[in-house]
């Protein structure tokens, strides 16, 4: 028993002088582990007479409990001290001013779409929307685009089946509007459109804004004046605008609209390919067949339509030379438009 008391005193002394949790664990293993000092003493009970074993066993258990209790107390003390030290090192000064977070901003394409809508809403146009998954009739047939037209080819259009597709323009919204209401009609139709194309200036998904006006006595002069005023309001410049004859199945006559290069002011540069002009949209008078298929009398009503790519206008307005930058989600690029 003297050896037992000495072991306990030795163990308690070691526990008191330990300053590390890992060292404390080593002490526990040394005295209470499977091969520990006190465990070995317990194994000697078999050498004692049977009548002495209960008494000696009880004393050994009391000794083990003393050491274990001391270990638990010291472990709690060491863990508390370590926590206090860490908290002191990581102390937060609540009197310091908060760290501000940079505010977000609208995407440049969203800004462009909103700007276009605002320009036309000021002159009485309403915003109309429609489905992005369209049927062949509204995307092609109702717009006077026959079955042999190249726009129906698989390399230009994303088809789901023979009748359903991703719209290639927002013109179907114009058709649905003419089917659901009678003139006068003044709408702009912003939205996503899809075509099989991808390079520096084209994307398989892009945003388009188309406009439609149908009323009595509408002429090409009305179309020309509307587009000229819109472009000058959008770019906030007195731009030179020109109309070039073109062809679209859903308008007759049709035209492409060019503006004086906003980069070089018409002097010629890489952006305008030294021509001094930039193509920005297509337009024309609504074809009588389109009006007729929407149950609008072309003898009584006339209309004009126009369409533009939002990314194209955003590139010109903000001086961006690669369309794909709008879709890369690079915060270094997008942060410039806050």
Curated annotation (Swiss-Prot):
This protein's UniProt keywords: Aminoacyl-tRNA synthetase, ATP-binding, Cytoplasm, Ligase, Magnesium, Metal-binding, Nucleotide-binding, Protein biosynthesis
Pfam families: Phe_tRNA-synt_N, tRNA-synt_2d
EC nos: 6.1.1.20
Reaction(s) the record says it catalyses: tRNA(Phe) + L-phenylalanine + ATP = L-phenylalanyl-tRNA(Phe) + AMP + diphosphate + H(+)
Single GO molecular function: phenylalanine-tRNA ligase activity
Positions annotated to bind Mg(2+): 252
Gene Ontology CC annotations of this record: cytoplasm
Keyword presence, GTP-binding: no
Cofactors, names only: Mg(2+)
Main localisation: cytoplasm
Cofactor note: Binds 2 magnesium ions per tetramer.
Subunit architecture: Tetramer of two alpha and two beta subunits.
Annotated family: Belongs to the class-II aminoacyl-tRNA synthetase family. Phe-tRNA synthetase alpha subunit type 1 subfamily.
Alphabetical list of HAMAP family matching this protein: Phe_tRNA_synth_alpha1 (MF_00281)
Name of the molecule in the record: Phenylalanine--tRNA ligase alpha subunit
């Amino acid at each position: 028993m003297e050896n037992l008391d000495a072991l306990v005193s030795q163990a308690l002394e070691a526990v008191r002088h330990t300053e590390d949790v890992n060292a404390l664990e080593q002490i526990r293993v040394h005295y209470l582990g499977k091969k520990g000092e006190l465990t070995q003493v317990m194994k000697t009970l078999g050498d004692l007479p049977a009548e002495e074993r209960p008494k000696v066993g009880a004393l050994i258990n009391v000794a083990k409990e003393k050491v274990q209790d001391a270990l638990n107390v010291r472990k709690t003390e060491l863990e508390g001290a370590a926590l206090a030290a860490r908290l002191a090192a990581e102390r937060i000064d609540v009197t310091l001013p908060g760290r501000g977070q940079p505010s977000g901003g609208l995407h440049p394409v969203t800004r462009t779409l909103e700007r276009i809508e605002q320009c036309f809403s000021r002159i009485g146009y309403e915003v109309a929307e429609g489905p992005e998954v369209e049927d062949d009739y509204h995307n092609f047939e109702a717009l006077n685009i026959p079955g042999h037209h190249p726009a129906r080819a698989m390399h230009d259009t994303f088809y789901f089946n023979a009748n359903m597709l991703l719209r290639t323009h927002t013109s179907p919204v114009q058709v649905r509007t003419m089917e659901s209401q009678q003139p006068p009609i003044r709408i702009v139709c912003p939205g996503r459109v899809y075509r099989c194309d991808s390079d520096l200036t084209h994307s398989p998904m892009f945003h388009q804004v188309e406009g439609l006006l149908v009323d009595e006595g509408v002429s090409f002069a009305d179309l020309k004046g509307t587009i000229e005023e819109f472009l000058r309001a959008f770019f906030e410049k007195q731009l030179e605008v020109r109309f070039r004859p073109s062809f679209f199945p859903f308008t007759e006559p049709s035209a492409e609209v060019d503006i004086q290069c906003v980069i070089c002011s018409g002097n010629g540069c890489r952006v305008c390919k030294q021509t001094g002009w930039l193509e920005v949209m297509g337009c024309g008078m609504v074809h009588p067949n389109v009006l007729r298929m929407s149950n609008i009398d072309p003898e009584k009503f006339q209309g004009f339509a126009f369409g533009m790519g939002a990314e194209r206008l955003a590139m010109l307005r903000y001086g961006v030379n690669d369309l794909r930058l709008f879709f890369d989600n690079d915060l270094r690029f997008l942060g410039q438009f806050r």
